[in-house]
């Protein structure tokens, strides 16, 4: 059925649901609580501000179809692991229209990085890799992404970004609460890969829902290998490999 929300709806209290389409209109709001799933087969239309539809950390907005028919912005919250001041995390956005600097406004503007496939490095002028990463030094990079002020850069769909913690992030392990605002991504998404250099590409989940890794690899078997790599390391920890590896359903930890 087509669902219209005209009052406060919180899945933790009111339950998960599936709808053919979903409209949030005057007087209404939707919160998809942590570990809950809302499934919308077709389009989601939010007639209000992004704060009227919130997908909490570990909450799931699942959609079907091959096209993105969504209109209106929502808020999606995603937490990092417990990280230290000056740690880095790889992020991608589950919505369209989220500003890069607005996502972490107290991170220094020159501490947002893209990955260069041809050099296998992060950064622009003097790059660095993530194997045994401590504090990248020396590091010379323009103020922003590829010379563009970070204030003027939006997350590109399915593209991964390396972002350092805010300058005032605690020195003790603390979760960074990421918040994205924009039109939720849905449907089939195509990302242009590079074959330069080693051929590695930094991509991320573009949806406000999980991706089945085995299905992802099988559906893209003609274009990628069967190995996926996941990076997470704390500054100063050089005892382990920087990347975890998933290969044909087998997972190899870096810990």
Q: At which residue positions do the language-model features occur?
A:
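N-terminal exported-region signature
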Residues: 1-255
């Amino acid at each position: 059925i087509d669902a219209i929300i005209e009052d406060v709806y919180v899945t933790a209290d009111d339950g998960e649901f599936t709808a053919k389409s979903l409209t949030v209109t005057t007087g209404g709001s939707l919160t998809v609580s942590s570990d809950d799933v809302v499934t919308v087969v077709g389009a989601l239309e939010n007639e209000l501000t992004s704060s009227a539809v919130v997908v909490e950390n570990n909450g799931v907005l699942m959609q079907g179809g091959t096209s993105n028919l969504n209109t209106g912005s929502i808020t999606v919250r995603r937490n990092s692991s417990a990280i230290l001041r000056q740690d880095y995390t790889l992020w991608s956005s589950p919505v369209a229209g989220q500003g890069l600097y607005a996502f972490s406004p107290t991170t220094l503007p020159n501490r947002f990085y893209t990955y260069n496939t041809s050099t296998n490095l992060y950064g622009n002028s003097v790059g660095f890799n993530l194997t045994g990463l401590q504090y990248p030094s020396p590091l010379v990079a323009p103020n922003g992404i590829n010379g563009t002020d970070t204030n003027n850069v939006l997350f590109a769909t399915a593209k991964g970004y390396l972002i350092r913690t805010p300058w005032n992030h605690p020195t003790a392990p603390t979760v960074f609460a990421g918040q994205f605002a924009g039109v939720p991504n849905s449907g089939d998404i195509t990302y242009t890969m590079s074959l330069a250099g080693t051929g590695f590409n930094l991509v991320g989940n573009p949806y406000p829902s999980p991706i089945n890794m085995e299905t992802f690899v099988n559906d893209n078997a003609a274009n990628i290998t069967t190995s996926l790599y996941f990076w997470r390391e704390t500054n100063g920890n050089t005892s382990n490999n920087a990347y975890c590896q998933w290969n044909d359903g087998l997972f190899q930890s870096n810990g």
